[in-house]
Amino acid sequence: MLTFVGLGLYDERSVTVAGRDAIRDADRVFAEFYTSRLIGTDIETLEDTLETSIERRDRAGIEQDPEPILEAAESEHVVFCTAGDTMVSTTHADLRLRAADRGIETRIVHGTTAQTAAGSLTGLQNYRFGKATTLPFEDAHGGDGVPDSVVATIEDNRDRDLHTLVYLDIKVDDPHWEESDDTYMTASQAATMLSEPFPDTLGVVVARAGSPDPLVAADTLDELATQTFGDPLHLLVIPGSLHPLEADTLESVAGAALE
């Protein structure tokens, strides 16, 4: 059996009780942290808290060589973990389908995601979010500025009067990324990049969702580009038009100066 467990947003306490129990009951536990991280903890603390040994896999070990996980799941109870939810944004549907093709039973234990936290913290209504996008570092996509696909996603959402959740690039355990380079894109870096195609546009920063000290800030992208927002992880939201309740919440919790 292969159980997918989302670990939540921040530290070893973010996992649900159901997720914790599944991990403790497993014969083997695998995890990946190349797409997102639990910033408030480390692998050793996770292992101590969850009373298990965690076998960490890199991107190639999940996408190109999943055999160790699948072979173990054919005869043992195996858990595969990620930050957030294993099937939301950081999707591992391919691994689940490979397991199903081999007759391996699968189960999903959901975790809190950045998508739900962004709506909760900002007061932006969840059903008014359109397609999300990820903003990569310029050096990561081999071009200058913002990729056309990111611009198109934001423009399409704005045409439909929808909010856009922008995930910010993470380069952790990436063999193609120099250790001296940034590993976590900051909201100010993202605002700098996006302010060119979207001048005079409102942005909403969400930093450290799920932690004891989350931060929410709203201003124009040009202004956000000049500010700092502390430790990662950061998200950026480009809102559509605001419902009065959304506007009131951003003014109250994010310091937005809305006309």
Swiss-Prot record:
InterPro entries: 4pyrrol_Mease, 4pyrrol_Methylase_sf, 4pyrrole_Mease_sub1, 4pyrrole_Mease_sub2, Dphthn_synthase
Pfam families linked: TP_methylase (PF00590)
GO MF term set: diphthine synthase activity
Biological processes annotated in GO: methylation; protein histidyl modification to diphthamide
Gene3D superfamilies: Cobalt-precorrin-4 Transmethylase, Domain 1, Methyltransferase, Cobalt-precorrin-4 Transmethylase, Domain 2
Keyword Transferase: yes
EC id: 2.1.1.98
UniProtKB keywords: Methyltransferase, S-adenosyl-L-methionine, Transferase
EC top class named in words: transferase
Pathway entry: Protein modification; peptidyl-diphthamide biosynthesis
CDD domains on file: DHP5_DphB (cd11647)
Catalytic activity: 2-[(3S)-amino-3-carboxypropyl]-L-histidyl-[translation elongation factor 2] + 3 S-adenosyl-L-methionine = diphthine-[translation elongation factor 2] + 3 S-adenosyl-L-homocysteine + 3 H(+)
Residues the record lists as binding S-adenosyl-L-methionine: 9, 85, 88, 113-114, 168, 209, 234
Record-stated family: Belongs to the diphthine synthase family.
Function: S-adenosyl-L-methionine-dependent methyltransferase that catalyzes the trimethylation of the amino group of the modified target histidine residue in translation elongation factor 2 (EF-2), to form an intermediate called diphthine. The three successive methylation reactions represent the second step of diphthamide biosynthesis.
NCBIfam families: dph5 (TIGR00522)
PANTHER family on file: DIPHTHINE METHYL ESTER SYNTHASE, DIPHTHINE SYNTHASE
Subunit organization: Homodimer.
HAMAP family: Diphthine_synth (MF_01084)
Protein known as: Diphthine synthase
Taxonomic source organism: Haloarcula marismortui (strain ATCC 43049 / DSM 3752 / JCM 8966 / VKM B-1809) (Halobacterium marismortui)
